[in-house]
Amino acid sequence: MEYDEEEVKVLKEVLSAFFLYRQYAHTITQQKRKSMSRLSFEHKDLLLQDSDNNFLKHLSRIDQCIEQNSVLAEAIANAAIPVFCSDFDQNELFHVNVDMMQKVSSTLKQIARDWSTECVEERRTTYAPFIEELNSLFPSDSIDRSKIRVLVPGSGLGRLAFDIAVEGFACQGNEFSYFMLLTSHFILNCVKQENQFLVYPYIHSFSNHVMRDDQVRSLNIPDAVPSQYLRNSQNFSMAAGDFLEVYGTEESRDSFQVVATCFFIDTTKNILDYLDTIKNCLVDGGYWINLGPLLYHFESEGTSNSNSDSQQQPFVELTLEQLFYVMDSMGFEVLKHNSVDTTYMGDKRSMLEWIYHPHYWVCRLQKSKLRFQ
């Protein structure tokens, strides 16, 4: 792969973040120990009185979990180097900020969501509707599914795209984040057996745990080995890059029979740009399947007083009612529409879970019915 100078810099920062995970995560437990050392004698004694289950021993258990997570984080980075950045030198790691380090922790949690058995119910709620709809629209006994091209923008760690490809469709995932791209490359291409790795996704937060064991419990990943299912690589591919830039071009016009967006359409500054791009890459009569909220990621940026270049860009956040009106004007005929309740990277043992009420719809693009070209 070839990247420009700025992309190479970002890649090296992301790779460095994976290699620095061990150091960063241990810093957190070290800070906890320092904080404890400043407690009064009485308070310290309360936390240490149980010799088998005191707070310092719990921190030591977390340190052991960090070591296991580091094995996975470094395996991801090592697998990515020859493919994405062959001149990367592990002896010259880039300085990365806390935000990037937190993205490594979040990526480990995302691995659990997409590729562990424990999180299968959350995937069933959010991914199964796509599979069921595709199977209904394109029955395998009457249609050659390998001729049906499905695009999954914002494909993350590739699980939805993988599940679609397993059903026989020609599926392409698209992802912009290098954290997701490097990790999905590892899962999709490098893992050799089920449950090959342990991940401890819940150790990075000390809040809302009922039991100490809840915080330090491990999950096995992956629950499926993609390389064993996707022997015909023509049925599955991943495309790196910004959705608007990759699929808003003349070359991408009328390229897909289906676009499947899951927790995605609120990740842009101007949602109308996404609609234009979906319309561009879908064939006439093609289907757009969506499930997700409208939690606009750039809303606060759009209301800031900054004079930066990004601030000069249009920010458009529509209600669902407004969105459906615009979709109708652009030729999207809504065939199905309902809502579901789901968590996102939830923890069933936690005292706190955010419940989303995302809407699900299936649209058919009728380009002959466009009110606006």
From Swiss-Prot:
GO terms for cellular component: cytosol; nucleus
Catalytic activity line of the entry: carnosine + S-adenosyl-L-methionine = anserine + S-adenosyl-L-homocysteine + H(+)
Enzyme Commission number: 2.1.1.22
Pfam families per the UniProt record, alphabetical: CARME
Protein's UniProt keywords contain Mitochondrion: no
InterPro entries recorded: CARME (IPR012901), SAM-dependent_MTases_sf (IPR029063)
Positions contributing to S-adenosyl-L-methionine binding: 110, 113, 154, 175, 242-243, 262, 274
Source organism superkingdom: Eukaryota
Record SMART domains: N2227
Family from the record: Belongs to the carnosine N-methyltransferase family.
Protein name: Carnosine N-methyltransferase
Organism: Schizosaccharomyces pombe (strain 972 / ATCC 24843)
Highest classification ranks of the organism: Eukaryota, Fungi, Dikarya, Ascomycota, Taphrinomycotina
